[in-house]
Amino acid sequence: MAGRGGLLMLENFIGGKFLPCSSYLDSYDPSTGEVYCHVPNSGKEEIEAAVEAARAAFPGWSSRSPQERSQVLQRLADLLEQSLEELAQAESKDQGKTITLARTMDIPRAVHNFRFFASSILHHTSECTQMDHLGCLHYTVRAPVGIAALISPWNLPLYLLTWKIAPAIAAGNTVIAKPSELTSVTAWMMCRLLEKAGVPPGVVNIVFGTGPRVGEALVSHPEVPLISFTGSQPTAERIMQLSAPHCKKLSLELGGKNPAVIFEDANLAECIPTTVRSSFANQGEICLCTSRIFVQRSIYSEFLKRFVEAARMWKVGIPSDPSADMGALISKAHLEKVRSYIKKARMEGAQILCGEGVDKLNLPPRNQAGYFMLPTVITDVKDESCCMKEEIFGPVTCVVPFDSEEEVIQRANNVKYGLAATVWSGNVGRVHRVAKKLQSGLVWTNCWLIRELNLPFGGMKSSGVGREGAKDSYEFFTEVKTITVKH
């Protein structure tokens, strides 16, 4: 709906209805730095209303068969697909990502999330064992848990929101979702499709606002037994504190400091363009992006030269430009945070080979105040540097040499995170050997970001708790019961 000054004004979606809020937050267009819409600044009152709606909807929705719920998810996928271009344009404007990425990755993946879980919910099986000597049969059944709190981040807004909503409602739960207040538009747009798809009122509730106000009210509510969160480690720690008194079930997908390990027998013709993409896709604002590149010393100079040349070829432009490879970062505060790491690297004696402070960024006059930054490559940086230890979450990557396999495994693992890694080598034995030793929940070899949704997704160490995927998400969003029948 139109709000103050003709700007878009979002509303909460509770119990199948759009409801206004008493106060609103400004939301900025990352490409211009200008306010372009208003987002509800919700709090405890809105969460109470959402809990009431979700509670009322749970008995009816949970009693529907998996086949019935599957049909609803399929219809919602169809409606999202029919709105693909509208959603892609909104996602690009709201988040700063390129329109090409929104069209080819974000929105198609949101569609696929519903289709995937609409199918997978039909194929889960239960366990059964017999104890003939005691005349007993044991079997398991799974049931939905109740109300799920789903908190999604700003980097892949609809993509990751639907990755949580789809398995939660497929399993028979009702949900209260809180998208990031920085990127709320496509979630609001999806709400308009829920009734058409046949989603009953109260099954999906979306409440907008900040973490401290609405997020804390949601995760601490005693009637919300499930929390699925994707975001930062400090926020996850706060969620754990607030939920601990209620012994809630948690799924936490957090950050990464992901290494690429490039051996001397790597196919550089494939490795270099893929590693540029894994470093800078979506402005480096993907938890799976590569931010530490270890290159075997014998090919280090050649790799570095070609990698920097390829990085400089990436076009930073306004998000609506189909030829742009990178758009704008999410906010002014985030841009300043990312730039601060470049300053720290310089102070530590590192070299900036391209990007921030080295190359010139050319933008149209209207976008001069936007949150843009060039792909930046850092070298001569120590493993103990903050740029090699901390998640920057921007278009910044460090390239360093290594000598031996044992050495690089130790160095790659020498961070608190363990989300993803890539390994490049033509030696199949080495690929398997190194992949097993890397402390990462996901390891891609000679590729990046090829996903199989049936398999577990998640990280080790400080990169999270739990896994997501067909089997893992189903188990998280259900409770298992063992039944014994003596005959």
Curated annotation (Swiss-Prot):
Domain of life of the organism encoding this protein: Eukaryota
Catalytic-site annotation from UniProt: E253, C287
First-listed, main subcellular location of the protein, grouped into a coarse class: cytoplasm
Compartments in which it is found: Cytoplasm
Keywords tagged on the record: Cytoplasm, NAD, Oxidoreductase
Pathway: Amino-acid degradation; L-kynurenine degradation
An example Gene Ontology biological process: retinal metabolic process
Family label: Belongs to the aldehyde dehydrogenase family.
Protein name: 2-aminomuconic semialdehyde dehydrogenase
Gene source species: Bos taurus (Bovine)
